[in-house]
Every structure is written in C-alpha cells, then in structure tokens.
C-alpha cells in the first residue's frame, strides 16, 4: 500500500461523506424523536447474560425508552477512517412490539435522533421473511436492518469499499446486540 493509495482513499472517503450529507429520505410519513433515558448501570457480565443470545424470543414487548436507548447508543462516534456522524450505512428497523409505538417499518435518522415511519402496520411475519424466512425474527420485538447504497460505495471507494461498510455495520450490530 503506497502513500498514493492512502491519499486516494482519503479523498474517496471525503467525497463519500459529502454525498451522504446531501442525501435525504423522501419517504418520511411521520417523524418521532427518540427518548433515551439513563438506565441502571449493569456490569458487563449481566449485560451479556441479558442480551438475548437464546434462539427463542419471549414475544414480550420492549418499551419505547428501551428502543430509544438502543438507538441512542448508535450515535456515539466510532474511531475509524471516517467520521461516524457521516456514516456510510443507514439503519432501518421493523417494530413488531414496542409499547407506545405503532407497528411498522422505520428509518432511524441519526442526524436529528428521530425515527421516521416508512410503512405502518407491518405484520410480524414480514421481519421473519426478510431474514431468510427464519421465524426467530418474527418473534423479536424489533428487527434491525443495516443498509448501504452499494453502487455508490463501489463507485467512490472502489471494489473493496464495501469493507468499510461491513466494518461500520459490525460495530453498529455489536452495539445493538449489547
């Protein structure tokens, strides 16, 4: 890896961030601010035990505050080659069972810490279907989808630019999981 390649990568990342700043989600139906609140501090071992590693979900709802805390954790910076505030991925989710929240498909707008309802009354089986028809995901209260515009990534960062998206997505998925 030569210094020219590093300079080109840095220019590509800057171009990618400029494009991401100008993108907008035009399918917004309803926007709702998230409501993160401090939660009782737990030890790492307690968090790991409670994180839902079981192959079965209880089909019990989570609260809007719990969902908000998960989403809020996704806004903290990630130390990498690019500014996390100018992410290369978008976060969508299907809310199957969240108290004080309509069932549906949502977009998490990290710029203003809000969620945008994209489609109301999405049935539980849709989240399972989208996860390779695994019923496990129909049972979950919320199912997250981390997406990117792969064509744009490849055009700007080259045919291996997807790796940056995978790296960022892995960190985000880890935060959701815990």
List where the protein language model places each region:
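N-terminal amphipathic, basic helical "cap/leader" segment at the start of enzyme domains
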Residues: 1-142
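C-terminal accessory/binding modules appended to enzymatic or scaffolding proteins
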Residues: 41, 46-47, 145-149, 153-156
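Small-aliphatic-rich amphipathic alpha-helix that forms the alpha element of a beta-alpha
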Residues: 70, 91, 144, 150, ...
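Short conserved micro-motifs at the rims of enzyme active sites and ligand-binding pockets
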Residues: 103-105, 155-158
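Short C-terminal domain-edge/linker segments immediately following a structured domain
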Residues: 122-126, 138, 148-149, 174-178
